[in-house]
């Protein structure tokens, strides 16, 4: 038995999503998703721009969709069935919320008569994600009222555009009652009236800065690339740029590794700026913000979400894009001050232990390689030693900074790149999202998964709890004793174990099709000792 009303309204929902810029869908199959999933599969055959991925693990699916949205900078839909399945999207929705990514959750639901009376696979899904999804709507696709279809067309476009404009996730809840089968190969013509939203650009008076010792701090950036405009401004006005590894602006013309420079006491009074103009999100290096506070350096924050400053040290916030800000900024910086900062990049960077992997990647990666970096030590090491010798696309989940979902997000990212991608991760992070590797196998994604295997959580060895010798290994070190060769075997991917980072270049030069797992082993205690020796070496240079 088929439902004509359900068929028509489902088509309108999918067409309205497409009219709003949605082209990529990640589906976690379940009984209640039946009408949406089937109509979507049919729509994919009819429209070459529609791409559908199937991920049977909802937690992985949420992050896979996030990876596509993060890389493409466009909304992506994840579709799931009712009950606890939908709750598995929560971690990805949380990351999308804080990272300002327009992730759209289509949550199929049980109808009203099955709510709150013990029906199986049923829970309250109305605004299930709470404040994490500022935008929410519930559509009754089986309602025959003539205004309902127009409502679906309008509200879908309105809310998707709102989610895109603000960089926020959206939940569309779909209560469905049986029969769930749509009418396939339906000839009903769907016509969507496009809803156009025009952004207004506010022009303000030129921003004149009288200070002559100004530094720009380019933080993590999930929005449009402004690297060319930033570097041109830096050259024209002699303003040094500290570029975070996730700023999309790091090159050999920008300052890198500031965390280690501060730690080694390189930034003496002659480097002290009168003003720091900060773009983007919170820098990977916490030490940079601590330095600004300690030195009481005035900070202006420029971002579409300016004012989100946990350091509470920002003195002036501009809610605008960096590009718009730079076009209105007038200043004359001190040339000697600029040159002094630029010379910081001449200081030798000694990469030891686990950081040697990031250093080697900096030397060997081809232009425009997409690299996803796990949190904890991997992203910190990358921020410290990756100079931006060539233009790379570096990504990470630095919204909530969790280690879950990293594999799936990286795999979503890899679907966008035309060349092989890289995931740099630790063994603990890989374990957290091992299910995600099924997508690499299923779609034969071209990605090299480089696992820094220190048998546990390396970052805790740098923290005070490492002194609690009696309890540390069980409570924080958490050795997993995973055999990575068996992980690779489980997902039918080539496996290579390297003795050190030096062999990475030759390894990556051997091209393969599909995913590949590369393991490099390190000892956690030796890694800590190496970092301490390196700090002493830097302090004496």
Curated annotation (Swiss-Prot):
Q: How is the cofactor bound?
A: Binds 1 thiamine pyrophosphate per subunit.
| A biological-process GO annotation | menaquinone biosynthetic process
To which pathway does this protein belong? Answer: Quinol/quinone metabolism; 1,4-dihydroxy-2-naphthoate biosynthesis; 1,4-dihydroxy-2-naphthoate from chorismate: step 2/7; Quinol/quinone metabolism; menaquinone biosynthesis
Q: What protein does this entry describe? A: 2-succinyl-5-enolpyruvyl-6-hydroxy-3-cyclohexene-1-carboxylate synthase
Give EC number(s), comma-separated: 2.2.1.9
What this protein catalyses is: isochorismate + 2-oxoglutarate + H(+) = 5-enolpyruvoyl-6-hydroxy-2-succinyl-cyclohex-3-ene-1-carboxylate + CO2
Sorted alphabetically, the keyword list is: Magnesium, Manganese, Menaquinone biosynthesis, Metal-binding, Thiamine pyrophosphate, Transferase
List the source organism: Leuconostoc citreum (strain KM20)
Family stated for the protein in its record: Belongs to the TPP enzyme family. MenD subfamily.
Q: Name one GO molecular function term.
A: manganese ion binding
